[in-house]
Amino acid sequence: MAQNTRTGDLTSGPMLQKIILFSLPLAASSILQLLFNAADVVVVGRFAGSTALAAVGSNGALINLLVNLFVGLSLGANVVAARCFGAKDDEGVHNTVQTSVTLGLVSGFLLAVVGFFAARVLLELMSCPEDVIGLSTLYLKIYFIGMPMTMLYNFSSALLRAVGDTRRPLFCLAVAGLINVVLNLVFVILFSMSVAGVALATIISQTVSACMVTALLVKEKGPLHLDLGHLGFHAGALGQILRIGLPAGLQSTVFSLSNVVIQSAVNSFGSIVVAGNSAASNLEGFVYTAMNAFAQAAVTFTSQNMGARRYDNLDRVMRNCLLCAIVTGLVLGGGASLLGEQLLHFYSSDEVVVTAGLARMHIICTTYLLCGCMDVLASCLRGRGYSVLPMVVSLVGSCLLRLVWIATIFRLFHTTTMLYLSYPVSWILTTLVHLACLLVVRHKMKNRPKLSIA
């Protein structure tokens, strides 16, 4: 039976309860996505050795660098669809759906070509260790072959989030996650395929999740219905998606560029530190995605309320999302830091790898709530229609600062501790500037109650 699209009203009722109910399936979905990579890392680390573990883990920053621009565009699709839905503009919702899915497929094919043919060169630019680069290149090439399906899932699930539906994408990912884990074990243990096996398992599972979520849109009877026979770009919808999504994507891309520079600095310490950093980064990802669910809630709730002209709800959305992100960061980040040694042993039995991972986790996990606050405030600005502003603030406050830190402080004190401290320092400064910008925007909106959302 088709889903009634008019069930995702995020503009009325108990806001905190709605935010939590919206965010929990979203957090679970993001965690399942992380489990794809975690399953790769754990199986490879346990059954293929530390070199294979470093090969898989060292690709994360580079993958994010190439992918995040287009993931930002899916955020634009989410904002535009949510605004149209809040304004009860059915034609606008439908045009956004057709445009978004088309954009997702085109983006995926572009990424597949670039990622496949440039893999080795990009890894060499990152100073990937010689004993790792061959396996890293193989993993990266196979991974990017599946990029059209990854982008299709991102854009399709963004459209479902726009109308408050976060539960059905969770089910799709749960099915795909089980497939991924089973295939990892089969390919690596039974067929001894090492990194090629985990990459192949990942793209098969991502294809399953993409097809399932897209099928949900096809079965819709309301404005969210996807007509596969009439895919294409609608100029108005595409323009709005690009206006919101490009700044967000550029911000994420430059963030990833700074992380690539940091990964290159990590690579300078050798494959043991690379392996420990990879395992720690994967664990930290679970904390981040749990917090980031509330940032995604902030942009969707803010966008719908802007579309419905319920400006009185905007402050409540911001306060509730900040509260949830802070509590999540404190509980999960603190817990991960305290249990870091035990958790890292899931990834590697090598004590020196575990020690290297702990050095990162004790700094990042204990301060991760700052990152959660930064993301929620940026999402509130985007939902209000200001996408360039948080991009500029983040690029200067986080990315540029990290690059300067590595070129100065890290060069003087060449230790992993000094390298990892660049994260919390950048989060503090960026959060403070985002807050100041949001207060200014809030004041402008109060003085212009008839503010246009176009």
What residue spans do the PLM features occupy?
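Transmembrane helical elements of multi-pass membrane transporters/channels
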Residues: 21-40, 142, 176, 205-209, ...
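Short alpha-helical transmembrane segments in multi-pass integral membrane proteins
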Residues: 1-23, 81-146, 179, 190-246, ...
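Alpha-helical transmembrane segments of multipass membrane proteins
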Residues: 38-41, 113, 121, 155-159, ...
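Short runs within selected transmembrane alpha-helices of multi-pass transporters and secretion channels
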Residues: 74, 142-161, 169-177, 198-213, ...
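Small-residue-rich hydrophobic transmembrane alpha-helices
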Residues: 53-113, 150-169, 263, 276-340, ...
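Alpha-helical transmembrane segments of multi-pass membrane transport proteins
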Residues: 17, 32-33, 70-71, 111, ...
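Residue-level signal for short hydrophobic patches within transmembrane helices
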Residues: 12, 16-35, 39, 62-69, ...
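Helix-terminus/linker motif at the lipid-water interface of multi-pass membrane proteins
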Residues: 31, 35-54, 123-130, 186-195, ...
